[in-house]
């Protein structure tokens, strides 16, 4: 495995491999890797000849400078994990390498990017599209892998690729990876205290219970079930919970409105903002 920090070196390496007919998988990350990321890389390794993992904390997608400053950075540990799971290259550029000058590009994929995360984190998805599109242009991968935990992000990236093309790039969504007790794996979990970690379990437990509840109750009652459960749980503050069409991300009012229904949630546990989702249909 090779650690690469410049675009020029990475492209030189990949051009040589591409000329041999090799397929290239890309797993974009912001580092602070965990077993969820490892599962993405393993899938990419199984489906491509060569896998590139980007390890870059992208400043343009943070609308909160405090959140950016606190985001964990663990490159040495990341490289250790990536070597074990078979990545060929770790691309860990500086901010100056990626953004030699400010990126002023504006991406708009309404209504996908105006709801949920888009409503509460203005500019976030524009920053995501800036970095992901740059990585696609730098790496020119055959396939790129994203986790379904960031459900809205995955939908927006699919739409971006549909509109821009990127040489027929295939976007592969991979299931949420959870701890044995159900907590969705997240780099932000490292910021939870032991007590907060216990509190955070109520998020996934509530979603799992709501799946059973939804089988015999309408959408509005399922919505209220989740909102009430989080409100009653210690140490948690609900930012939003929405039951949406999994393709359009628009709210549904009846289970018959769609064949693909997903509940998306964001909760503050102390100062740590956690996201999760669950499929009700589809």
From Swiss-Prot:
Active-site residues from the entry: 37
One Gene Ontology term of the molecular function aspect: ATP binding
Binding site for (R)-pantoate: 61, 153
Listed Pfam families: Pantoate_ligase
Catalytic activity annotation: (R)-pantoate + beta-alanine + ATP = (R)-pantothenate + AMP + diphosphate + H(+)
Assembly and oligomerization: Homodimer.
NCBIfam families: panC (TIGR00018)
Protein name: Pantothenate synthetase
UniProt organism field: Phocaeicola vulgatus (strain ATCC 8482 / DSM 1447 / JCM 5826 / CCUG 4940 / NBRC 14291 / NCTC 11154) (Bacteroides vulgatus)
Lineage: Bacteria, Pseudomonadati, Bacteroidota, Bacteroidia, Bacteroidales
